[in-house]
């Protein structure tokens, strides 16, 4: 499956906000001008962005935050739309409960990309069973852990240490000494940090 492998800072500049693709703990704001588009001098335009353009940009931003490609993102939206409740919130909950995102939220990876790599390299177990599919949906009560052979990896130890300092999300409980965590419940919308306006995505797919 094709994925963007270019400079991560360029994606954040394109969206005009830090997507935290390089690190969840270190902001890019001090390193580059997030309000300047990629290009030699930053692309500028006096034209007003259309409603469609604004909606499309929001969708692209969320796809980049979670590392999801278009076809998969459409499937998530279709599932979110089928479920009861608010479609936008359902969409974010589906994305937040992806295994790679849960590994990231528990602090085992410093970025979602790093967490995805840990899953793909079979360094993660779910309820004691080795998991290697980043998109696997984690359910309330599931226990996610680092395999014994991977516990000494410096990047995992460092990421977990930084996550502990910054604080864990309320919907996960992590035992750093055991390198494992429990997905307690689906996060509420207010619990999901990030500059995301999911209603724009719902409007886009409702056109």
Curated annotation (Swiss-Prot):
GO molecular function: rRNA binding; structural constituent of ribosome
Biased composition (Polar residues): 42-53
CDD domains: S4
Pfam family, one: Ribosomal_S4
Coiled-coil stretches: none
Entry keywords, A to Z: Ribonucleoprotein, Ribosomal protein, RNA-binding, rRNA-binding
SUPFAM superfamilies: Alpha-L RNA-binding motif
BP GO terms, sorted: ribosomal small subunit biogenesis; translation
Entry superkingdom: Bacteria
Entries under InterPro entries matching the protein: Ribosomal_uS4 (IPR022801), Ribosomal_uS4_bac-type (IPR005709), Ribosomal_uS4_CS (IPR018079), Ribosomal_uS4_N (IPR001912), S4_RNA-bd (IPR002942), S4_RNA-bd_sf (IPR036986)
Domain S4 RNA-binding span(s) in chain numbering: 97-160
GO terms for cellular component: small ribosomal subunit
Region Disordered: start-end pairs: 31-55
Ubl conjugation among keywords: no
HAMAP family reported for this sequence: Ribosomal_uS4_B (MF_01306_B)
Subunit comment: Part of the 30S ribosomal subunit. Contacts protein S5. The interaction surface between S4 and S5 is involved in control of translational fidelity.
Family statement: Belongs to the universal ribosomal protein uS4 family.
Function: One of the primary rRNA binding proteins, it binds directly to 16S rRNA where it nucleates assembly of the body of the 30S subunit. With S5 and S12 plays an important role in translational accuracy.
PANTHER family (UniProt xref): 30S 40S RIBOSOMAL PROTEIN, SMALL RIBOSOMAL SUBUNIT PROTEIN US4M
Protein name per UniProt: Small ribosomal subunit protein uS4
Source organism of the structure: Burkholderia ambifaria (strain MC40-6)
């Amino acid at each position: 499956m094709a994925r963007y492998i270019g400079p991560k800072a360029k994606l954040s500049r394109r969206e005009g906000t830090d997507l935290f693709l390089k690190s969840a703990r270190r902001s890019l704001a001090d390193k580059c001008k997030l309000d300047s588009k990629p290009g030699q001098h930053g692309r500028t335009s006096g034209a007003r962005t259309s409603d469609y353009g604004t909606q499309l940009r929001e969708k692209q931003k969320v796809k980049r935050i979670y590392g999801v490609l278009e076809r998969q993102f459409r499937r998530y939206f279709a599932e979110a739309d089928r479920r009861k409740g608010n479609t936008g919130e359902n969409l974010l909950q589906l994305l937040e409960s992806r295994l790679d995102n849960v590994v990231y939220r528990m602090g085992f990876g410093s970025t979602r990309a790093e967490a995805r790599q840990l899953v793909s390299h079979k360094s993660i177990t779910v309820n004691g069973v080795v998991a290697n599919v980043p998109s696997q949906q984690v359910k309330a009560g599931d226990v996610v852990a680092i395999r014994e052979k991977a516990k000494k990896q410096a990047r995992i130890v460092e990421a977990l240490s930084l996550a502990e300092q910054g604080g864990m999300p309320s919907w996960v409980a992590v035992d750093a000494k055991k390198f494992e965590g429990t997905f307690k419940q689906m996060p509420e919308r207010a619990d999901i940090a990030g500059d995301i306006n999911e209603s724009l995505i719902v409007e886009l797919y409702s056109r």
